């Protein structure tokens, strides 16, 4: 959204269309409705090549359901390619911008065959399969981390950082108090926000639910669970109040919620991490070590290397949910150390990233 806002500022009139997979479409439409209702959201059939970082290659090849899903999804990728090819022929855009992920592969290949300039942005510190393929053909590549973490061609790659909204900035004490009032949490208590991203994070949600009563001894808690586990967690947790809130998904005002927080527990999704860096927020990362290529582990390592965040091993959290309480207490009990950690974290923020990526897209258009 930050890039789209910059494009609209720099290039009027402009026609923009947002493409995504069907699973994300409801959230995308909600987000676009708040951003610009005139931007249509289109869905693309797509499949993904499932690979799990915590499993050996041999075990994955001998797992029948995994093999069958991958074979099925090969046909979905092919269907998505033909769908994208037809849509691009009809629309004929001047440039295609992709952010990685399996849905971008058929779109990017179709753009290549139609000679439509392709710009990609790689948020993760480790390129995924889609971006490794599309990076060969892309006209320009923007990266979320320093170029040393990538193998892309240096002559078309730029370290821009990750585009985020200007809503994500360091909050003053007054702004934090106002944000706590907006979210109806106790302004006199530390605020602990737990978020696994838009789709949630089951193991993190489960650990939070187990440790919740002890976390509430440290401050107010807001848990953003994702829609999939919301009903289950609603039956296990207290009603929403000024000390605890459960939300399935937040389509707007996420910046104010994170800005109000005294500490945030999150996954190692690249965009969320950089939003928190821009907020200069003491952050505890629980990377999902099971994801393809271990990209969340690699994302977390970039910041852990600079002592800019605290990192909890997910397996330890599953075995001992109290580690969440211990780590939050460490942050809250030593504000000076937490502030120094947040200052190191803020050094990764790139406030001009959205404008820089927008400039790359506009200049790459044919």
Predicted features along the sequence, with ranges:
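A short, well-ordered alpha-helix in the C-terminal region of glycosyltransferases
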Residues: 181, 330, 337-351
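Active-site-proximal region of nucleotide-activated glycan assembly enzymes
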Residues: 14, 38, 112-177, 185
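C-terminal alpha-helical cap of glycosyltransferases
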Residues: 350-366
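Glycosyltransferase specificity loop/lid
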Residues: 1-75
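Glycosyltransferases and closely related glycan-assembly transferases
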Residues: 34-38, 82-97, 104-119, 132, ...
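Donor-nucleotide binding loops and adjacent catalytic segments primarily
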Residues: 18-19, 24, 32, 52, ...
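Structural loop-to-beta junction motif characteristic of Rossmann-like glycosyltransferase folds
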Residues: 116-117, 262-263, 280-288, 308
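Acidic donor-binding loop of glycosyltransferase active sites
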Residues: 94-95, 259-274, 281-282
């Amino acid at each position: 959204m930050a890039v789209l806002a910059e494009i609209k500022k720099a290039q009027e009139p402009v026609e923009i269309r947002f493409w995504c997979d069907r699973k994300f479409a409801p959230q995308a439409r909600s987000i676009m409705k708040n951003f610009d209702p005139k931007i249509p959201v289109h869905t693309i059939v797509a499949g993904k090549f499932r690979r799990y970082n915590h499993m050996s290659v041999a075990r994955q090849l001998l797992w029948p359901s995994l093999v069958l899903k991958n074979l099925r999804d090969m046909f979905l990728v092919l269907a998505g390619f033909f769908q994208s090819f037809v849509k691009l022929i009809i629309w004929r855009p001047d440039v295609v911008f992709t952010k990685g992920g399996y849905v971008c592969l058929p779109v990017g290949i179709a753009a290549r065959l139609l000679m439509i300039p392709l710009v990609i942005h790689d948020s993760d510190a480790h390129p995924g399969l889609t971006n490794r393929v599309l990076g060969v053909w892309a006209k320009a590549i923007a990266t979320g981390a320093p170029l040393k973490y990538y193998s892309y061609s240096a002559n078309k790659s730029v370290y821009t950082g990750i585009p985020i909204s200007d809503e994500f900035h360091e909050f003053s004490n007054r702004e934090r108090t106002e944000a706590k009032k907006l979210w109806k949490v106790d302004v006199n208590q530390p605020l602990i926000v737990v978020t696994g991203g838009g789709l949630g994070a089951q193991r993190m949600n489960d650990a939070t639910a187990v440790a919740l009563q002890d976390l509430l001894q440290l401050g107010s808690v807001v848990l953003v669970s994702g829609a999939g586990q919301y009903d289950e967690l609603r039956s296990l947790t207290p009603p929403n109040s000024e000390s605890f809130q459960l939300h399935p998904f937040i389509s707007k005002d996420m910046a104010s919620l994170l800005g109000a927080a005294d500490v945030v527990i999150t996954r190692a999704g690249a965009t969320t991490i950089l939003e928190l860096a821009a907020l200069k927020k003491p952050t505890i990362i629980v990377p999902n070590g099971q994801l393809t290529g271990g990209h969340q582990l690699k994302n977390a390592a970039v910041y852990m290397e600079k002592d800019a965040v605290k990192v909890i091993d997910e397996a330890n959290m599953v075995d001992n949910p109290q580690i969440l309480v211990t780590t939050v207490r460490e942050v809250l009990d030593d504000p000076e150390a937490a502030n120094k950690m947040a200052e190191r974290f803020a050094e990764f923020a790139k406030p001009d990233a959205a404008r820089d990526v927008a400039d790359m897209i506009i200049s790459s258009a044919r």
